[in-house]
Structure formats: C-alpha cells, structure tokens
C-alpha cells in the first residue's frame, strides 16, 4: 500500500547462517514439540545487506534484534545463548536500521545486569528481551526484580514473551496476568507483553487497559489469524496507543499486507506499525 508508513518491527533474532547453524546444533538432544516441528527453523539471510534489501522491499525502516537467552527446561543449559557481539554486528554497522535488545539470565543476575548496563550505555541498546519459560520461574519471580529495577534506572523497557511458548517447555510462567504484579511494583517501568499473550489474550488486554506502563505486542502471528478481541483492542480509543507490531521472523511484506486488511482506522494502523514503537522505546 503506497500510503503505508515505514514500519518498525519490534521482534526479531540474529539471522546469520552461522547463528542459525549454532542454534540448530544446540537443539540436538532437546525435546522438540509438535508445533515447533511444523513451523521449522528461524529465518536466515546470507548477509545483512540481503536482509536490508528484504526490509526495503517490504517498507520496514527498523528491526529490533534480540539477544535471546533461552534456557533448556529439560537439560538445564543455555541452549540459545545469543552473544552481545552477535547483535552488535547489526546495530553498530547499521545503527539507523537495527535496534538492540539485551538478554537476561536470572541464574546469573550480577553478570547479566552488568552486560545490560554496558549494552545500553555503551552500545545504545533500547531495552531488554526476556524468554522466561525454560528457567521455570514466573515473570514476577523475585529473581526477575533486579532486572526490572535496573531497567527503571536505565530508563529502558522490558519486552517479555507472554502467553504460550512454542518450544518444549510449560507455558504457565509466561501468563500475561503476571505483568499485573510487575506493573504495580514498578510503576516507572515500561513493559511490553510480546506475542499477543495467546491463549490468554484477554489477560494481556486487561493488564494493558489497567496500567499506563504496559504495552501489547502484536507479533509472532500472521495478522489474519489474530483473534477478534485483539483487532478490536488495537482499533479502540484506549488500545490504539498501546499496541506495537512485530514479526518474530515471519515475512515482513505478507504481515504488513495483512495488517492493511484488518480494517483498522488509519491512525490505529499508523500507531501500530510505527508510532507506538517510537514512543515505547524512545527512538
């Protein structure tokens, strides 16, 4: 669509062949669940310029690259252990196109907080991304509170996967209602519940309605499959300021084309795919 604003994707991964090969090898010996087998591997690009070309073709201005830390629920090791340098290869060479989100390991709190502070203050990262499930603690566990306090200090948001998890680990610890505790205990912390919160969509919507500091992530789903409750929310007076768009590696052009087909008001679409991300992450 020619009048579509340049989009900002708030959820992506390191997508180099080297990283994907490392991730594929790490999953050997892990239990792979039915959905993960059906969907397949994360996307990869032969080079970052190739990725930029695809972004340009789709009308995507910026992509957030997450330093994802994923703990194995079964084998108790960091089987997705994205290094800061793997994100920096995007953000330092192409700072106008890529935004970094640091990772957090609640089992290595001191080291994690030091790396987060370095990522934000030295390298310009704009927040932190958390994949909680394999750690087998809920989002409002006290091991998470040092992270939330640090992000208040640094004035950056925390993005957390909320809802079910694709990988072979229980989903309960990512329930969106746990953001209710965090928002109450850290009213100055900007929180993003990513991945729509499904199957607890209404929980995430309720928390976003209640708190000024919680945002709704419309990512990891092709928009044509979004529940009507989500579409109604992001098209509503109170919801249109709280929702941000991302892909989690799904194809940009198809996703944005499907956003165009949701019947959103023009201002709601503009805020969803661009303006709200700029506000949330202070771009």
Residue map of PLM features:
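Catalytic pocket-lining loop regions of alpha/beta-barrel enzymes
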Residues: 122-127, 136-244
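Conserved phosphate-coordination/catalytic loops
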Residues: 42-46, 78-81, 110, 138, ...
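Short aromatic-enriched loop/helix-cap "lid" or pocket-rim segments at secondary-structure transitions
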Residues: 18-23, 75-78, 113, 170-172, ...
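Flexible loop residues that form catalytic
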Residues: 13-15, 68, 133, 196-197, ...
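Mid-to-C-terminal alpha-helical segments outside catalytic/metal-binding sites
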Residues: 2-62, 118, 238-244, 252-283
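Active-site gating/metal-coordination segments in enzymes
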Residues: 61-62, 67-160, 164-166, 170-173
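Alpha-helical scaffolding within the catalytic cores
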Residues: 46-54, 82-88, 114, 176-179, ...
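Conserved, mostly hydrophobic/aromatic
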Residues: 11, 55, 87, 119, ...
């Amino acid at each position: 669509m020619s009048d579509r604003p340049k989009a900002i994707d708030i959820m992506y991964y390191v997508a180099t062949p080297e990283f994907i090969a490392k991730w594929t090898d790490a999953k050997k010996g892990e239990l792979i669940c039915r959905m993960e087998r059906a969907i397949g591997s994360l996307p990869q690009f032969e080079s970052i310029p190739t990725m930029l070309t695809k972004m340009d073709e789709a009308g995507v201005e910026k992509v957030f690259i997450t330093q994802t830390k994923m703990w194995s629920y079964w084998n108790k090791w960091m089987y997705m252990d994205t290094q800061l340098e793997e994100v920096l290869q995007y953000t330092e060479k192409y700072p106008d196109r890529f935004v970094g989100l640091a990772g957090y390991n609640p089992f290595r709190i001191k080291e994690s907080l030091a790396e987060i502070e370095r990522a934000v203050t030295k390298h310009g990262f704009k927040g932190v991304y958390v994949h909680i499930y394999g750690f087998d603690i809920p989002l409002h566990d006290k091991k998470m509170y040092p992270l939330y306090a640090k992000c208040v200090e640094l004035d950056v948001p925390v993005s957390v996967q909320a809802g079910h998890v694709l990988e072979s680990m229980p989903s309960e610890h990512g329930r969106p209602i746990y953001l209710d505790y965090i928002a109450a205990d850290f009213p100055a912390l900007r929180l993003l519940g990513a991945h729509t919160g499904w199957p607890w969509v209404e929980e995430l919507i309720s928390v976003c309605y209640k708190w000024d500091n919680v945002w709704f992530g419309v990512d990891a789903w092709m928009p044509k499959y979004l529940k009507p409750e989500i579409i109604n929310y992001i098209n509503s007076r109170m919801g249109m300021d709280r929702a941000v768009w991302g892909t989690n590696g799904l194809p940009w052009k198809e996703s944005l084309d499907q956003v165009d087909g949701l019947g959103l008001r023009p201002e709601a679409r503009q805020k969803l795919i661009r303006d709200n991300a700029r506000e949330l992450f202070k771009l």
